[in-house]
């Protein structure tokens, strides 16, 4: 025989009655009846569970409108701003490069109004959506033409599909990389309908290896920049200039996937060198692909530079339409590229470069300012220290190189890992979550990417 329902269940008001109460009118106007009804059902389910466990009504059942408003205020957006104190500047899971203010403004303008996405003001007819950005890229890199898609994986896939479907692609064995999300070059080639031909060895590949692999079915000679790992020691590799010369000699196009790609010499800012697309174009490579949201500091996009005859083939392929960038991406990319026309102001205007070049002394001073107020908040349960550390660029850029930085560390006085886990879990529930990293029994907050100290203190003191 089933148990009798708890008598307190009868004190829970009906949804329709609650929605018709005068106190609900402001909430109905703000959120609408569907969301309110769904949220009230959730609250009632929780109230029944509370009654079943404690045999009494929860305190919030005395004021349903207040409980409803509190629950609605706790709703989380799908994408939530966070403090990135992980020590990884271009963190893939945290959205990679923050956009420049001019790029944010350009995206906002593009969202608010009709724009000349595929409309030519000169001829009052249909234009090409890549044209304006392509012209900027050509001016900055010396390429003949450019093509924009929604990310670099799409750029590589489009390039392989158009240039070498049903043909062989020759690649050094040491460059068959896997990037995030199990994106493997051999798998991409297979999906694009290409036959992979591996040459050389993991650590040494010579020009003769490429030459010996060429036959009547060779469609492409390709290099892939190993942006997320490095092989050192007894190594040899074929330069882009050598490979381009071989391709021209044999009438076979050449391509390089740079992955990250920087339009400026990073050593100019005290950072490690990274291959630049314009260098490869000057070396004679036919097509070069790279990302928009890594070292470039722009939105997620895949950029393909190269010879006009090949870019036109890419633009005309049906797959290009499926992979094309939208107006917001193009607006942000256009605004970001314009910053490169003023290289002397780039550090000032491009957030990613500003964070990468931030002096260690400035970060240390930030740590000193934060230490005392955070000890006041957390000193009972944690020992707080200032420690030197190494930041990384992230997103597969310059994998070996590190940037000197400073961090605040939190060591639990009880020595328990569960205490650290509880702290990090609580910080993830903040209005603006604080994301650090746990290592060596401590929580590390690398301060390289912190630009609003007051906002961080407000969150951590809440």
Curated annotation (Swiss-Prot):
Subcellular location, principal: cytoplasm
Catalyses which reaction(s): L-seryl-tRNA(Sec) + selenophosphate + H(+) = L-selenocysteinyl-tRNA(Sec) + phosphate
CC cofactor: pyridoxal 5'-phosphate
UniProt keyword Cytoplasm, yes or no: yes
Entry keywords, A to Z: Cytoplasm, Protein biosynthesis, Pyridoxal phosphate, Selenium, Transferase
Recorded metabolic or biological pathway in which this protein acts: Aminoacyl-tRNA biosynthesis; selenocysteinyl-tRNA(Sec) biosynthesis; selenocysteinyl-tRNA(Sec) from L-seryl-tRNA(Sec) (bacterial route): step 1/1
Modified residues annotated as N6-(pyridoxal phosphate)lysine in this record: 294
Coiled coil segments of this chain: none
EC number: 2.9.1.1
Keyword Lipid biosynthesis set for record: no
InterPro entries, sorted: PyrdxlP-dep_Trfase, PyrdxlP-dep_Trfase_major, SelA-like, SelA_trans, SelA_trans_N_dom
GO biological process: conversion of seryl-tRNAsec to selenocys-tRNAsec; selenocysteine incorporation
Compartment(s) of residence: Cytoplasm
Pfam families: Se-cys_synth_N, SelA
One term under GO cellular component: cytoplasm
Domain of life: Bacteria
Family: Belongs to the SelA family.
Function, in words: Converts seryl-tRNA(Sec) to selenocysteinyl-tRNA(Sec) required for selenoprotein biosynthesis.
HAMAP family documented for this protein: SelA
Subunit structure: Homodecamer; pentamer of dimers. Binds only one seryl-tRNA(Sec) per dimer.
Protein name: L-seryl-tRNA(Sec) selenium transferase
């Amino acid at each position: 025989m089933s148990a009798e329902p708890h008598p307190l269940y009868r004190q829970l008001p009906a949804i329709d009655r609650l929605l018709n109460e005068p106190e609900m009118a402001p909430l109905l106007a703000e959120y609408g009846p569907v969301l309110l009804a769904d949220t009230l059902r959730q609250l009632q389910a929780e109230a029944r569970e509370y009654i079943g466990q404690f045999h009494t009504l929860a305190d919030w059942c005395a004021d349903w409108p207040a409980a409803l408003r509190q629950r609605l205020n706790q709703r989380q957006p799908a994408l939530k701003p966070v403090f990135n104190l992980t020590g990884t500047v271009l963190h893939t899971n945290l959205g990679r490069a923050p956009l420049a203010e001019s790029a944010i403004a350009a995206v906002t303008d593009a969202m608010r109004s009709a724009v000349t996405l595929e409309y030519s003001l000169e001829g009052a007819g249909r234009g090409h959506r890549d044209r304006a950005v392509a012209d900027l890229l050509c001016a900055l890199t010396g390429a003949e033409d450019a093509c924009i898609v929604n990310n670099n994986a799409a750029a590589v896939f489009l390039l392989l599909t158009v240039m070498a479907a049903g043909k062989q692609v020759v690649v050094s064995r040491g460059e068959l990389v896997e990037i995030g999300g199990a994106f493997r070059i051999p798998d991409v080639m297979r999906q694009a309908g290409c036959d992979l031909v591996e040459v050389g060895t993991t650590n040494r590949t010579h020009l003769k290896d490429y030459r010996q692999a060429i036959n009547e079915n060779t469609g492409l000679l390709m290099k892939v920049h190993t942006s997320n790992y490095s092989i050192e020691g007894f190594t040899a590799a074929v330069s882009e200039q050598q490979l381009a010369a071989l391709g021209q000699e044999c009438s076979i196009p050449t391509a390089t996937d740079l992955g990250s790609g920087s339009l400026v010499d990073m050593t100019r800012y005290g950072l490690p060198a990274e291959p630049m697309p314009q260098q490869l174009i000057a070396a004679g490579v036919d097509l070069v692909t790279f990302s928009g949201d890594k070292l470039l500091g722009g939105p997620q996009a895949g950029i393909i530079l190269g010879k006009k005859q090949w870019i036109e083939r890419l633009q005309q392929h049906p797959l290009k339409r499926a992979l094309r960038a939208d107006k917001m991406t193009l607006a942000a990319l256009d605004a970001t590229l314009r910053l490169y026309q003023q290289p002397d102001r780039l550090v000032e205007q491009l957030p990613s470069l500003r964070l990468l070049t931030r002096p260690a002394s400035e970060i240390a001073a930030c740590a000193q300012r934060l230490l005392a107020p955070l000890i006041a908040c957390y000193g009972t349960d944690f020992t707080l220290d200032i420690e030197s550390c190494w930041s990384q660029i992230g997103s597969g850029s310059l994998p070996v190189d590190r940037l000197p930085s400073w961090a605040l560390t939190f060591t639990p006085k009880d020595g328990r890992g569960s205490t650290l886990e509880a702290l990090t879990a609580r910080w993830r529930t903040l209005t603006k979550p604080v994301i650090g990293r746990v290592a060596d029994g401590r929580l590390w907050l690398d301060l390289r990417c912190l630009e609003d100290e007051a906002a961080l203190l407000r969150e951590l003191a809440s």
